[in-house]
Amino acid sequence: MNLPNKLTIFRILCIPVFVVLMLVNTIPYNNYIAVGVFIIASLTDMLDGKIARKYNLVTNFGKFMDPLADKLLVSAALICLCGSKIPVWIVIIIISRELFISGFRTLAADQGIVLAAGWWGKFKTTFQMIMIIVLILDIPLKAFDIIGWILIWISLALTIISMIDYVAKNIQ
């Protein structure tokens, strides 16, 4: 197994650690530690792709699992923030998009076609990760609340745009 694929697996293994930190309030500074774990996991998303492309280590496993790892990480964070920081209906829309695209990719994989993530999807994921970090930090400033809401709405818009783009480019 090459390094980019190991980074993808590491990102997936970070998810339960992140969730425990988000949900167990008895751990001192749990939100800050959770943000640290989330940032490290998110950075592996950038690293695995760059390393894979630079050293010609792109694999079908990576093309399939890298976006899935992103979906799992972001979805876990959204579920942890659901209701308290993000309205439930927005979380439902975002996770529904992720499930739809995962199903779409699975159908393609059954036919021997591996659909790589597109630019809009990568942009959406990056934006969602930034939004999640801002919301978890929960800095008690009005400007920070406004930034959080702006990020939520932009993430929702990018979720819809990226789904339309993905389906339009890959429907066969």
What are these regions (language model features)?
Residues 1-172:
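Alpha-helical transmembrane bundles and membrane-interface segments of multipass inner-membrane proteins
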